[in-house]
């Protein structure tokens, strides 16, 4: 604790963000890291708690509290305050393989459980983390770590998202020969095609993939298991296989008019936009274009917000985002106490941009889409909705009830369905013969072994839709279990 009175004297700061209207003109990152001095000030606010709840990584009432990868947050906060940046980087990398990702797109459950947040704004942990790793790359402190010895064991990893990359990194450092298979044309999975460039610039992902390649990991893209290579071939060629395919099966909205032209899954929209941007700066026209259209995003989460931001950059005529839940309160309520994840109203980057563009927040709350209507050519022209009320039933459980008389018709030529994911796609599960429940691969947490010998599973493919930090956590842990399976014991943390 470098400055015992820091939390009393220094206010929380946000990193600089580009003007919303200016950033709508391009696809570059909307935010910037802290300056060195700002990071030191914010590090001084850390109280070095005896029990640092910021790093507990616990599940409280179904939500994540604290960091799931157990980042040594008070330690590197203090080192940053003291200007010992390289040591701060070393402490950060002990637990987090990819701080350049989490420092940008993680929802920061660490801050929600920060002890200071009981009475004051939390320490700016996420932005300090980003500044540490960015400074590490800028100063050349991060160089390829090529293993000095190889074990002679080979591991195949299916999927190159955060769980796959974390397990690959760990196993490679343990001396195993690792090959990562990715069905897309670029490695990175969700990091590459699931998150827009203005939120996570793809050069940052490519830099990490290049580093992992230099360290000895092989990436095989444009390769789908069951099409280009069979599961049996993988099991024959490798000593162990890890399934890290993510939860790619998108949840559908099966209502009247769903088959209208202009209704798309959110991830299809985001993926095509990013791919076209990377391939040709949109010159190939191989994307879903919202220009001049009334756009409605169904689903109130982060993926929906990314659709809003993408549509704004494409110069949509109007954008609305529908969510079934009521608007969150401005501060914690008595049934949402610290250190639970705070369920409070926030204004994310996409909503700031919509307010700047249209003068209003695009979110509509407690609303249910009842049907979609197409014109005589089958093209979507409008959505019908009704307001909902969230109430407790006689059993004490919440349920949603329609409010008669609140029906409304919305003009719409594009709709993006962003209501979550159901789990792993079935063809892959059948290829390997692994057991599953509700499209999630059956493999116990902490063990990660499926019912098929030598086949493991981790990340969203196992646990369902979750956070990037949980994917990294499971990638690291499954690597340890695979190392133990191959060698009898493990050198990995």
Swiss-Prot record:
This is Glutamate synthase [NADPH] small chain. InterPro entries: DPD_II, FAD/NAD-bd_sf, FAD/NAD-binding_dom, Glut_synth_ssu1, Glutamate_Synthase, Helical_ferredxn. One of its GO terms (biological process) is L-glutamate biosynthetic process. SUPFAM superfamilies: alpha-helical ferredoxin, Nucleotide-binding domain. Pathway: Amino-acid biosynthesis; L-glutamate biosynthesis via GLT pathway; L-glutamate from 2-oxoglutarate and L-glutamine (NADP(+) route): step 1/1; Energy metabolism; nitrogen metabolism. NADP(+) binds at residues 299-313. Pfam families: Fer4_20, Pyr_redox_2. It comes from Bacillus subtilis (strain 168). It is an enzyme of class 1 (oxidoreductase). Gene3D superfamilies: Alpha-helical ferredoxin, FAD/NAD(P)-binding domain. The lineage of its organism: Bacteria, Bacillati, Bacillota, Bacilli, Bacillales.
């Amino acid at each position: 604790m470098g400055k015992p009175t820091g939390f009393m004297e220094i206010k929380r700061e946000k990193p600089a963000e580009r003007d919303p209207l200016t950033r709508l003109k391009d696809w570059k990152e909307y935010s910037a890291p802290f300056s060195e001095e700002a990071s030191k000030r914010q590090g001084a606010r850390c109280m070095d708690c005896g029990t640092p709840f910021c790093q507990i990584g616990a599940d409280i009432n179904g939500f994540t509290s604290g960091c799931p990868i157990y980042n040594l947050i008070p330690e590197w906060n203090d080192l940053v305050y003291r200007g010992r940046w390289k040591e701060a980087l070393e402490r950060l990398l002990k637990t987090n393989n990819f701080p350049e990702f989490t420092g940008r797109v993680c929802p920061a459950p660490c801050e929600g459980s920060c002890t200071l947040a009981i009475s004051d704004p939390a320490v700016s942990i996420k932005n300090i983390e980003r500044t540490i790793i960015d400074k590490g790359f800028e100063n050349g402190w991060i160089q390829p770590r090529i293993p000095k010895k190889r074990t002679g064991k080979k591991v195949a990893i299916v999927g190159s998202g955060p769980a796959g990359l974390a397990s690959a990194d760990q196993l490679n450092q343990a001396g195993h020969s690792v090959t990562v298979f990715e069905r897309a044309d670029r490695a990175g999975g969700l990091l590459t095609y699931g998150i827009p460039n203005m939120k996570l610039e793809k050069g940052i992902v490519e830099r990490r993939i290049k580093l992992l390649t230099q360290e000895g990991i092989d990436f095989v893209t444009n390769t789908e298991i069951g099409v280009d290579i069979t599961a049996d071939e993988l099991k024959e060629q490798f000593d162990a296989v890890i399934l890290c395919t993510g939860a790619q099966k998108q949840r559908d909205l099966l209502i009247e008019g769903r088959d209208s032209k202009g209704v798309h899954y959110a991830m299809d929209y985001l993926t095509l936009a990013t791919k076209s941007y990377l391939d040709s700066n949109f010159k190939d026209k191989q994307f879903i274009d919202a220009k001049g259209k009334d756009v409605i995003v169904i689903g109130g989460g982060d993926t929906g917000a990314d659709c809003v931001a993408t549509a704004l950059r494409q110069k949509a005529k109007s954008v609305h985002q529908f969510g079934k839940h009521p608007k969150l309160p401005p501060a914690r309520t008595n049934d949402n106490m610290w250190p639970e994840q705070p369920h409070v109203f926030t204004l994310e980057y996409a909503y700031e941009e919509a307010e700047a563009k249209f003068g209003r927040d695009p979110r509509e709350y407690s609303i249910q889409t009842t049907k979609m209507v197409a014109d005589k050519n089958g093209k979507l022209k409008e959505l019908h909705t009704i307001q909902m009320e969230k109430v407790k039933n006689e059993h004490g459980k919440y349920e949603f009830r329609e409010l008669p008389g609140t029906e409304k018709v919305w003009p719409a030529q594009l709709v993006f369905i962003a209501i979550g994911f159901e789990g792993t796609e079935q063809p892959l599960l059948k290829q390997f013969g692994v057991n599953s429940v509700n499209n999630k691969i059956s493999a116990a947490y902490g063990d990660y072994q499926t019912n098929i010998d030598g086949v493991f599973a981790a990340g969203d493919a196992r646990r369902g839709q979750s956070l990037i930090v949980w994917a990294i956590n499971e990638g690291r842990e499954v690597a340890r279990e695979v190392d133990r399976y191959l060698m009898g014991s493990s050198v990995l943390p």
